């Protein structure tokens, strides 16, 4: 992969435009940025070829499922951390894999169809990997914001307003055809409607209508990610905190409005809030926490850590400097090997039968020191 210089201002404006309108044609983007269509296309090709920026999309809801996200901490034995991380990063339902500073080795963010699926993943996938020492999982009860909504914020206000399309929010329940469409788009989010129609055996009109419905209903999350070091955000930090339940809505609304915040999630567990931020320097971590304390004094930060290497971000594998290496389209976890192992455990639980020990065999005696008499058992 070629080495590339850091982003210039036009690069960052292009990224912001694509974060807002990821499928806009180059002519529209060129007019928005005040350059030619060929310039925008050429710029984007250079960024993607260097692994500095990339597009992605993934479903936020699945047909007939109450899917959810879990934040999993993984401890590894010495010398096995990256072996474990690489195996976990290959799992298609895993959004993020991060090597952290502090008391946990890896942080994994993944999606699951139900709680039983999470149990199988912890017990029969992670638990079976050579090098995994321990796992701890917290379930995301509310996702207040996530990284697909983060913006580079490099467009002028007038341009930014012009690029935003206001659409009414409607509740959309996806079906199997929607899932096929979203999975296909995950491989190339700018795939033309005609080619999408050909790959999914749908008409172009149907594809366009479904895409509009999925986007306006927030079923499909579009994202344009960047190599954060090259983009000027070299520090990625994560904070765990506790909030009184009655203050969660007010405090998280403030957090979501802070530019540095990439993820803000309410979770189960003793720390009921998890926040991820991008920062310009380590010094900015203290400044961010100071602002946080002034805005939300009732929030207690219980722990914090810094990313050492984010190996996976939104389904994309990254090098140590945050550049994209390759993509793994996000999809449901293929559970079969783990499910087979779980079924064997269930069968063992179902068929194991150990009769309670006879009092005499167990050495049980009554108040008088004698063994109680049992019906049908003759004294020896």
Model regions: which residues?
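A compositional/biophysical signature of low hydrophobicity enriched in polar/charged and small residues
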Residues: 1-380
């Amino acid at each position: 992969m070629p080495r590339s210089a850091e982003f210039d201002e036009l690069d960052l404006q292009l990224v912001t435009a694509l974060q807002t309108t990821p499928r806009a044609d180059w002519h529209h983007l060129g007019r928005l940025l005040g350059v030619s269509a060929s310039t925008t296309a050429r710029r984007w090709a250079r960024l993607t070829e260097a692994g500095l920026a990339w597009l992605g999309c993934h479903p936020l809801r699945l047909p007939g499922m109450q899917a959810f996200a879990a934040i999993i901490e993984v401890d590894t034995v010495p010398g096995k951390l990256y072996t474990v991380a690489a195996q976990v990063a290959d799992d298609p339902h895993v959004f993020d894999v991060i090597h952290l500073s502090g008391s946990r080795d890896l942080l994994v963010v993944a999606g699951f169809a139900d709680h039983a699926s999470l149990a199988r993943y912890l017990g029969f996938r992670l638990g079976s990997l050579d090098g995994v020492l321990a796992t701890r999982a917290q379930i995301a009860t509310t996702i207040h914001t996530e990284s697909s909504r983060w913006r580079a914020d490099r467009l002028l206000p007038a341009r930014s307003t012009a690029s935003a399309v206001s659409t009414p929010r409607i509740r959309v329940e996806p079906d199997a055809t929607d899932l096929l469409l979203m999975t296909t788009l995950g491989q190339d989010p700018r795939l033309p409607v005609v080619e999408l129609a050909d790959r999914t055996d749908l008409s172009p009109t149907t594809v366009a209508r479904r895409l509009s419905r999925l986007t306006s209903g927030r079923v499909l999350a579009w994202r344009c990610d960047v190599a954060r070091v090259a983009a000027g955000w070299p520090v990625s930090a994560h904070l765990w905190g506790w909030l009184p339940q009655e203050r969660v809505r007010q405090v998280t609304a403030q957090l979501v409005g802070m530019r540095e915040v990439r993820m803000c999630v309410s979770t189960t567990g003793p720390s009921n809030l998890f926040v991820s931020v991008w920062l310009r320097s380590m010094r900015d971590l203290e400044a961010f926490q100071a602002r946080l304390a002034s805005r939300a004094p009732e929030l207690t930060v219980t722990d914090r850590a810094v990313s050492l290497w984010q190996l996976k971000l939104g389904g994309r594998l990254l090098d140590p400097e945050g550049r994209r290496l390759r993509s793994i389209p996000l999809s449901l976890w293929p559970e079969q090997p783990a499910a087979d192992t779980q079924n064997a455990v269930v069968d063992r639980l179902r068929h194991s039968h150990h009769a309670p020990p006879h009092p005499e065999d167990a050495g049980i005696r009554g108040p008088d020191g004698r063994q109680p008499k049992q019906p049908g058992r003759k004294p020896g």
